């Protein structure tokens, strides 16, 4: 199957810059702002957005990773109970404005799992959602506050995000 490039390296960089500016406008600066990237590619994107915000505001926004593995609705409930804290960040996110970062927003189930993981032990002031790509086909009533690119797709198509940190290239492709 051939791939169709939707975003190349330069387009991804511009998109991250725009999302960073939108997050700053949404939050009116960096006060109480925390970024949580959904493992794996969302975490790398969160750090890229953190770097961009730092270059704009000269403020290092606390950034961490959230692993939703044990909060997915397609795993055994016994496994779900084993996980106490699914996020890795060095600040308390209670009473903070948390922005969840994901690479592709599709059915909404990954985002729902991340909300479950966050709200199990903490109470942020507000939670926002940023996605590099929104491909539609939602199964839950979830919408991103910040979207890099809306890509209408067929259900049988696959949207892949490649990031140089793990894939040795930057691209968003439909396969």
Swiss-Prot record:
Gene3D superfamilies: 3.40.50.2020. One of its GO terms (molecular function) is uracil phosphoribosyltransferase activity. It holds the Pfam family Pribosyltran. InterPro entries: PRibTrfase_dom, PRTase-like, PyrR, PyrR_bifunctional. It is an enzyme of class 2 (transferase). Homodimer and homohexamer; in equilibrium. GO terms for biological process: DNA-templated transcription termination. Belongs to the purine/pyrimidine phosphoribosyltransferase family. PyrR subfamily. Substrate binds at residues 40-41, 85, 102-110, 135, 159. Its EC number is 2.4.2.9. A motif (PRPP-binding) lies at residues 98-110. Regulates transcriptional attenuation of the pyrimidine nucleotide (pyr) operon by binding in a uridine-dependent manner to specific sites on pyr mRNA. This disrupts an antiterminator hairpin in the RNA and favors formation of a downstream transcription terminator, leading to a reduced expression of downstream genes. Keywords: Glycosyltransferase, RNA-binding, Transcription, Transcription regulation, Transcription termination, Transferase. The lineage of its organism: Bacteria, Bacillati, Bacillota, Bacilli, Bacillales. It catalyses: UMP + diphosphate = 5-phospho-alpha-D-ribose 1-diphosphate + uracil. This is Bifunctional protein PyrR.
